[in-house]
């Protein structure tokens, strides 16, 4: 997931309705809606969610589940088969809503999340949410937030340690700053050493530590919030 290279700069490309645009030797044709893509570097692209992405998410949720050991793992421990089935159904419905919302975006719509493509392959996503002064998640409509927290997941381990997360979050941060986000945070738990290292690499510093609030695989860990300092 991490590389020694410095975070790359990003450029934003808007694909207008019924417009065929060539981006770095790749021709992309989008009909009937506005689509936004951010070229984080030559290999990493941030883009809006598509209908065909839902199949990937179902696979990641049910088969290729290693990522659940690291991304809020306390949500996945001890679930019954009935609970898994119910939550999967709700998740698929939520994915459908995201696709529907994305289909209504205009060129001025501010995105709170992007899918991540690596060399044209859908490998993950990054998202953002508002937090309050105690670093708890707020409803998106709340106007009294401390700032916006960002998160990322590269689901398949084979795509980690390729600099994907570094490039994707750099592009996402640039996008959020360009659209008015003044304070940017990221949150994780003290057992996720890769995410901590990534946050520090990108210029985040520890802002808040909540001792012992996470229990993962029999261990007790701290909840961490980092703030971007540059």
Task: Name each region found by the language model.
Residues 177, 194, 216-217:
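Short secondary-structure boundary/hinge segments and terminal tails
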Residues 161-175, 197-201:
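Conserved acetyl-CoA-binding loop-helix of GNAT-fold acetyltransferases
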Residues 56, 149, 167, 183, ...:
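Amphipathic alpha-helical recognition patches that constitute DNA-binding helices
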Residues 133, 185-188, 205-221:
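Conserved catalytic-core motifs of GNAT/GCN5-like acyltransferases
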Residues 155, 186-196:
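Conserved beta-strand-loop-alpha-helix junction that forms the acyl-donor binding cleft
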Residues 2-6, 15-157, 219-230:
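GNAT-family acyltransferases
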């Amino acid at each position: 997931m991490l590389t020694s290279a410095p975070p790359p700069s990003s450029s934003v490309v808007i694909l207008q309705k019924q417009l065929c645009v060539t981006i770095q030797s790749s021709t992309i044709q989008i009909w009937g809606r506005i689509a936004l893509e951010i070229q984080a570097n030559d290999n990493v692209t941030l883009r809006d969610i598509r209908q065909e992405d839902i199949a990937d998410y179902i696979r990641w949720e049910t088969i290729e589940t290693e990522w659940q050991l690291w991304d809020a793992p306390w949500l996945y421990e001890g679930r019954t088969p009935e609970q898994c089935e119910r939550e999967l159904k709700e998740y698929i419905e939520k994915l459908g809503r995201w696709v529907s919302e994305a289909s209504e975006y205009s060129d001025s719509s501010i995105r709170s999340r992007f899918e991540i493509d690596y060399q044209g392959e859908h490998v993950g996503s990054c998202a953002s949410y508002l937090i309050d002064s105690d670093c708890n998640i707020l409803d998106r409509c709340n106007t009294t937030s401390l700032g916006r927290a960002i998160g990322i997941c590269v689901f398949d381990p084979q795509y980690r340690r390729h600099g994907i997360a570094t490039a994707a979050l750099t592009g996402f941060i640039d996008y959020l700053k360009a659209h008015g986000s003044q304070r940017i945070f990221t949150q994780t738990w003290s057992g996720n050493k890769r995410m901590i290292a990534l946050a520090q690499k990108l210029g985040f510093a520890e802002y808040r530590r909540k001792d012992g609030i996470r229990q993962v695989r029999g261990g007790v860990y701290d909840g961490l919030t980092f703030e971007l300092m540059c």
